[in-house]
Structures are given as structure tokens and as C-alpha cells.
């Protein structure tokens, strides 16, 4: 997992609330077994509309998504997070996230940042007025800066540390590889090992 400390990038203003995981990545994309290649399916039904914001060349290469409240509702599918990441997003800023989506995002290195609705609105308006507007998501300081806005956000210390170290569940476990090897060596030979 890629470490996240401070990220500065342009943003895509998605003026929609209650965006569910089926809208983020439709179910026909869930047949894939790898984690890459999902960017093409991101919001694919909406992207069929030429006026959809992701189709605007002014937002090409943006790495931050500005979303309405209740982003990531619906079924639990890590594919939604993988699609956002594969498209190039490092962070999503919203007034509220579905709990399961938030957990999946944090577990995969996509930073879901909860900000007051008026802050998200101010950032969205600024990006709509000037798509070259850059926003900084500073996990070290737990702060978002851009377009004259400075807003703090909450994230527990352990999750923050994991993101800053680039550790998903597997990476965290592998930090204890030597302990695991010692433990397995002390067990009867007929028991399974990780090697």
C-alpha cells in the first residue's frame, strides 16, 4: 500500500449525495479477480453522459474527489475503493461517509476525509470556478487546505500511523514475520505454517 502523508492535487467536484457503491462501480465489474483495471468502470453509467464531470478534460489527472454527503452507501465492495484508486484518486472529501465504505477505504490506502458541509461546498465552488485549484490533504497535521479554506479533520492515531507507514492488514502482519517464524518453529511439524 502506498504511504500517505501530505498530498496536493487538483479535485473533481461531484455534486451528488447518497452515492452508493453500485454507482461508484456497477456490479458487472465485480467479476474481475485482480485489483487493477477498475478505473474504467468508475461511475461508468454516469460517464455515458458527455456532460458528467469526469468527462470534462479540465479535471483530467485530478487526484481528490469532492463529494456530497453519504458517499459510499450501499453494499460493501472493496471494488468501489479500488476503482477510485485505479482512476487516480488519493482522497475523497465529504461531509459524511458510509461506515463500511470508510473502513474499506482506510484499509486500502484511500483517505476518506470528513469535513463540514460548508467547507466541502466552498472547495467545490472554488474548483468549479477554477479547475486548476489545488487542495492539500495533510495527514500529518490532520488538515485540509485550499481555496482559502483550512479545516482540520479527525482520524484515530493508529489508522493515521498505518496510512503514513503504508501498511494494510497484510503489511502490518508482515512486520511480525520473524515472530511468526519463531512461533511456527515451536509447533509440531504436522501443523500448517505460512511458509
Swiss-Prot record:
Its EC number is 4.2.1.33. Pathway: Amino-acid biosynthesis; L-leucine biosynthesis; L-leucine from 3-methyl-2-oxobutanoate: step 2/4. Pfam families: Aconitase_C. Gene3D superfamilies: Aconitase, domain 4 (3.20.19.10). Keywords: Amino-acid biosynthesis, Branched-chain amino acid biosynthesis, Leucine biosynthesis, Lyase. The keyword Cytoplasm does not apply. One of its GO terms (cellular component) is 3-isopropylmalate dehydratase complex. GO terms for molecular function: 3-isopropylmalate dehydratase activity. It is an enzyme of class 4 (lyase). Heterodimer of LeuC and LeuD. Belongs to the LeuD family. LeuD type 1 subfamily. Catalyzes the isomerization between 2-isopropylmalate and 3-isopropylmalate, via the formation of 2-isopropylmaleate. This is 3-isopropylmalate dehydratase small subunit. The lineage of its organism: Bacteria, Bacillati, Actinomycetota, Actinomycetes, Frankiales.
